[in-house]
Every structure is written in structure tokens, then in C-alpha cells.
Regions:
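Terminal targeting segments of Actinobacterial cell-envelope proteins
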Residues: 1-26
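Solvent-exposed, non-transmembrane regions of membrane-associated and secreted proteins
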Residues: 21, 27-28, 38-252
């Protein structure tokens, strides 16, 4: 009597190919998962590291170009309309142009000679700190409002949570230095555009103070709200006649 043949004895029986195909499918899925994992790791590395490298290089280029423009007579730059600000005149910047440098001693590892550009569009925020074009210029009555990334793309305001009431923010323009003192902060909705009004929270009010507003995303990796800091102008220096602010001199 002939013994029964099992799939373990004869690979030609129907059960064997099904098992082989199943293991092949598992292998393909495993390779796909590994590939996806590698791609995700590369994307994370790009976001967390490489975008900062690119942004830092772009910011350095903006600083070099801005300081070069300051070394030439204003009439040779072809800049926009001049407006009276603080100790002298500033040229109203063109959209996308860098026009100031910002220094925050508390955040000196990130914001020390950081360029301020006339734009809050994403490509420009990857080159420095952005100035809301509809708000006032440094030293002007009203609200000099700026925005910056807190995560990736240079992340100038990464450590906004370290800021404290009384901290100083310095803004350098062609002919002047401005010192602002931080007064208060608040977490708001992304739709709360009133935070950059000339008089925040008082629509239509005529400004009498010279304010600064720092805006950034919150929480750092979720960006569901906005972290706002307001400050007031506390001092000005004319580059032609005054010495450097002590905090700037100490930091150099």
C-alpha cells in the first residue's frame, strides 16, 4: 500500500507554492517598510538639521549684503521712500529686502545680528526674521511687529519660552540703534491679528507709544497657537555721535 504524500515530502503538491508566495509577500512588505523608514528618517534629518544649515547660510548672506549697503551712501542704494524714525531717517525697505539687524541678549545663541526682512512670507522667513510690512518701522510710534520660526528653517525664536519681562531687544538700522524692553507676553490664536495693531487690542486708536511685537509658533512642534511678546522703546543711540549700547559692546 502506497503511503500518503504530504506537502513536506513533495514540493509539487498545492500547499507548498501557497506558503512560498506568502513568505515572498512578507519579504516584499518588509523591504517596503524599511524603505519607508529610511525615507522618513531622511525627511526628519532634512527638516531638523539641513533646513537650519540652509537658513543660517542665507541669513549670513543677508547680513553681508546689508552691511555692504550701509557702507555706501544712501543715494547710491536706490532704496525706497525715506521716513522720519527715531534719531534720523530710514529708507522704507522694499518687499523681501533686509533692512535691520536684531540682537536679543537672552537668545544670543540664535538672535545676535539676525537680519530683519520686509516680509513674513515663508521663503523670506527662511532667511531671517520677518517684519510685517503693514506695521511700523523701528523707532516709529506704533508697533514694529516681527515674526520668526521657532522650529526648523533657522528657528531664530526657538527659545522664546526663555524670555522674561524686562529683557532687552536691540534693533540696528543704518544710522541708529533702538533698545526695546519686553513688558508682557500672551498665547493667542493664529487668527488674532490684533496683536500687531498700532495699539494692540484697541482698533483705530492713535498710537503714542513705540512698541515692538515678537510673534512665533506655539507649541514648538505643533504650532496650534501663537506666542506673543510685546515691548516698549526704552532707548535710542545715534551711530554718528553715540557709543555702542553696552550690551552690544559686551557681546562682541
Amino acid at each position: 500500500m502506497t503511503a500518503a504524500v504530504t506537502s513536506e515530502q513533495d514540493p509539487q503538491v498545492p500547499g507548498a507554492p501557497r506558503a512560498s508566495r506568502a513568505w515572498a509577500a512578507v519579504g516584499v512588505i518588509g523591504e517596503l517598510l524599511i524603505t519607508v523608514g529610511v525615507v522618513l528618517l531622511l525627511f526628519v534629518a532634512y527638516q531638523l538639521w539641513w533646513t537650519n544649515v540652509v537658513a543660517d547660510r542665507a541669513a549670513d548672506q543677508q547680513v553681508i549684503a546689508l552691511q555692504d549697503s550701509w557702507s555706501r551712501p544712501p543715494s547710491a542704494q536706490g532704496e525706497g521712500e525715506e521716513v522720519q524714525e527715531g534719531n534720523g531717517k530710514q529708507a522704507r525697505p522694499k518687499l523681501g529686502d533686509a533692512f535691520a539687524l536684531m540682537y536679543i541678549p537672552r537668545l544670543s545663541d540664535k538672535v545676535w545680528g539676525m537680519p530683519v526682512l520686509e516680509s513674513v512670507e515663508l521663503p523670506d522667513l527662511a532667511r531671517g526674521i520677518g517684519h510685517y510690512p503693514e506695521t511700523q518701522l523701528p523707532g516709529q510710534k506704533g508697533n514694529f511687529a516681527v515674526a520668526a520660526h521657532r522650529a526648523t528653517n533657522g528657528e531664530p525664536f526657538r527659545d522664546v519660552d526663555r524670555l522674561q519681562v524686562g529683557d532687552k531687544v536691540y534693533v540696528e538700522v543704518r544710522d541708529s540703534w533702538f533698545e526695546y524692553t519686553l513688558k508682557r507676553d500672551q498665547i493667542v490664536s493664529p487668527q488674532d491679528g490684533w496683536v500687531i495693531d498700532p495699539v494692540p487690542g484697541e482698533p483705530g486708536a492713535k498710537p503714542v507709544e513705540r512698541l515692538i511685537t515678537l510673534t512665533t509658533c506655539n507649541p514648538r512642534w505643533a504650532s496650534t497657537t501663537r506666542w506673543i511678546w510685546w515691548g516698549e522703546l526704552s532707548n535710542t543711540w545715534d551711530k554718528a555721535t553715540d557709543k555702542l549700547p553696552a550690551a552690544i559692546k559686551a557681546g562682541r
